[in-house]
Amino acid sequence: MTLIKLDTHTIDQGTLPCTDLKNPNSPELFTYNRDWLLDRFEEGMVIIKLDTSKDAFIEYVPAEFAWKPIHAPGYTFINHVYVEDDGPEQWLKSELLQTAETNNSKSNGMVIMLENKDFNRDRDFYLQRGYLEHAHIPGFTMLVKKFKTEIPVPAFAMPISEKSNPLNRHGIRISYADQSAFINYYIHEMKVIFEDMGFNVEMHRIDTPENARESGSPYGTFGVFMDGHFLTHKLLNKHGIEELIGSLDLNEMYPEYKYLIAS
């Protein structure tokens, strides 16, 4: 099996799917912007593909340049391990993970953040390969494999939500990174839908790893907030947004609401 390292010279050898932010209207996966990838290469990102007929790649970066809410100096952060139809043995996925670990054996260790549904699916895969379930924030689990013993362990570095501001009611903030024209299309579709529902919408572009860490979203590069309260990191169509808003306990989010009405 041939391993292909993508860099500024080999980036055009196939596309890379964005496996986290999926099209809300179809199962089709997005692909990253070429310029986005080139900028990430400058930050030390590495992508290794397997020379197969199906998508199979691992993407990792020095944790200091991870666009995620983590603090893990000296570690290597795994953005994605993706294999299309790997089969129950997951040997292609294991090959990619082992390659990344070997390439980064002089670092403090490896860190990966998984959505809880992915963690529940892949828990045994990572635990059997020496990763420890280390920390949690709502919806996400951090796994760590240390290569050195007496070093600080990684940590989440973010506020999940902020105190609501009763003077700025019905405000939606959409924070996003410019990863893909397709993703940006759906983000702006969400903006229109929220505005049609009567919300004031603020768009905030995330343009550095530091911004992503401080965005307030556990996903880092995308988040939707209502008056400072984190709502979702998912791309949603109109039906999804209506379900999201309908599921909120506004009395819990805004305990001062009745007082404001009475005054």
Residue ranges, per PLM feature:
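C-terminal "cap" of GNAT-fold acetyltransferases
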Residues: 139-165
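Conserved beta-strand in the GNAT
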Residues: 49, 53-64, 77, 82
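Conserved acetyl-CoA-binding loop-helix of GNAT-fold acetyltransferases
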Residues: 83, 88-102, 128
